[in-house]
Every structure is written in structure tokens, then in C-alpha cells.
Amino acid sequence: VEALFTVDEETGLTGAFELGEEMLTGKYLINLDSEDEGEIFIGCAGGIDTIATFRYTMEEAPKNYSFFRVDVSDLQGGHSGDDIDKGRVNSNKTVARLLWDGMQSFELKLSYFNGGNLRNAIPREAYAIFGVPTRFKSEFVKRYDLFAADLKAEFRFREPNFKITLNEMPEVDQVLDARTQFGLVYSLVGVPNGVIAMSFAMPGLVETSTNLASVKFEGDDRIVVTTSQRSSVESAKVYASQMIESVFALAGAEVSHSEGYPGWAPNPQSKLLEITVASYEKLFGVKPKVRAIHAGLECGLFLEKYPHLEMVSFGPTLRGVHSPDERLEIATVPKFWDLLADILKKVE
């Protein structure tokens, strides 16, 4: 038995990328990185990150402006692959909607925007600092109240804990230059987010998606917007990244892409899968579900370097992955362990 431990799986797949082509000698690989007990995974999506960088300058804040901070919080967030079909609200998108509306009607000036963190998580919090002419202050606050009420009604079934707050700020000295503000806000509103296509090969499986992961001011001259695209079809993954690039390029950003990673094409005739299903049925008296997942597993990279490998992936039940609410269902751990031990006894 060989044991393969990798580093940096959550943020960059560095360990899997650096795996040598002559390190493994086995013909079977059992990946222990899945999140639903009772389900055996035999395929996954490939992924790529698309990063937009806006170069900006700060200008002196105009006179007679009142400044505010808007916060969006308490969204569910979740994994940007496995949870992308659940309709989770994106905090970056939500803040951008308010800014866009303010630009149309109230001569809004943006000073700061911060939202999201991990590239592979649906962002659950974001905030922005901005100003409107003091003569529009009371009218803007009324518009905000209507906007917040509309959002709470819009999100009430999918985000019951959603919060949006508006607080007046002390005087702000600087605001973003007008060109960058326009490009940033319009692209955040316009860029696709969520499910792009469902799979025709495996009904119920998301084929292609994109996630507006984070918006960060970096240094004193850059705003970096990080997005991630996933697909079980390589050409669709590339096209999704081109779609995202096009929106940000039109908005004046410099756009780059990560190296990306391949998907894992299912092999329903795998001997290892046959052994795994038989072991599960013997141990627990029911057949496991066999499916693919719309998330990035290292298996695609392993298969690229070891094309002869037969692979399955399973694990105990996890929820809220890649969010502060991540948790493990302890009762599923013994079943996970017993299944692994039984499979290892049977493989040759």
C-alpha cells in the first residue's frame, strides 16, 4: 500500500501539480477527499481561475458629499463547486448592485470595496465605502431602505439570515477615479456568476459554472478581482474563462488566468469501482450512489500523470465546506473507515 499526501489542495493544488510521474507504482488510487457518505465519486470538474486587475488612482473627495458604509453579511456561502447549484447569494454581486443603482441616480463616488476571500468559496460577506452629494442624502437613504427591503424579499427563501446594513461614515478624504469606478462596478454587475450549463451526459450534474470569489484593494494602485470557472467539459471550461475575461477586458482591466487543472472523466467499468460498490453493499446492506461531482478533486491531475490509474473517491459527510460553518458528521466516520479497510483487503 502506498499513501500519497499532498499540500495546498484547498488554494492551489500545488502538491498535485508537483507530483512526479514515477512516484506511484500502484494501479488503483482511492481518494479520500469527498464529502457525502454513501456516495462514491468517479468523476469531477476541471477548473481555472480568471483574475482581473484594475489599475486605479485616488482623487480628492468632492465637497459637500456624505459618506456611508454598506455591509452585506450572514449569507450561507459554501463551496463554489458543490454548492453552486443551490442558488446561494453572492455578497460581491449584492454590494455591486447597490453601487450601480447609486451611480445612476445619486452621483455616487466609490472609495473602497472589499468582499470574499477564498477563490473556491462562494463569498458570504462584502462591504463598500462611498459617498453621495449631501443634497441627495435623505433621498438616497429612502432609496436604500426600499432596496434593502426588496433584497430581503428576493432572498427570503434561499438566504433567510441575510443582512444588509448602512451606516454613515466620518468624512472621507479620497475616492476612486471615475474611469476605474465605472469599469469596476459595471463589470461586477455584468459578469456571469453561478451555473452556466447543466450536464446532458449526467442529468442533475452541473456541467459549467463560474464564481465571483473576491474583490480586493491591493497596494495603493490595484484592485484585484478573482473568479473561478469549473466544467466537466474542457472546451466549456476554456470558453467560460474567455467569457469572464471579455467582460473585464471591456471594463478596462488587465486579465490573466491560472494554469488550471483537468477534470476526471468517469470510468463506470472500473474494477476498483466494482470492488468499492460490492464492499459497501456487503457492509451496510444498501448500494451506494455512484456519481460525479462539480468540484475540483486532485484526481484529474493524478490521471494526467498516471493515465492507467483506476480511481474512486469517498469520505465522511462534511457540510459548509470552505466556510466558517464547516462541520463533520461524526456518525459517518466509522462507516468511512470500515469501507476503506474492507476495500484494501480486497484489492490485489
Residue ranges and their predicted role:
Residues 1-63, 87, 109-111, 196-199, ...:
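Acidic/histidine-rich catalytic neighborhood of metal-dependent amide-processing enzymes
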Residues 60-65, 84-114, 133-209, 244:
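Acidic-enriched catalytic cores of C-N bond-cleaving enzymes acting on peptides and small amides
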Residues 127-129, 163-175, 213, 224-234, ...:
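A short beta-alpha structural unit
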Residues 187-250:
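Long, well-ordered mid-to-C-terminal structural blocks that present hydrophobic/aromatic surfaces
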Residues 200, 207-221, 228, 283-343:
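Zn-dependent metallopeptidase/amidohydrolase metal-coordination segment
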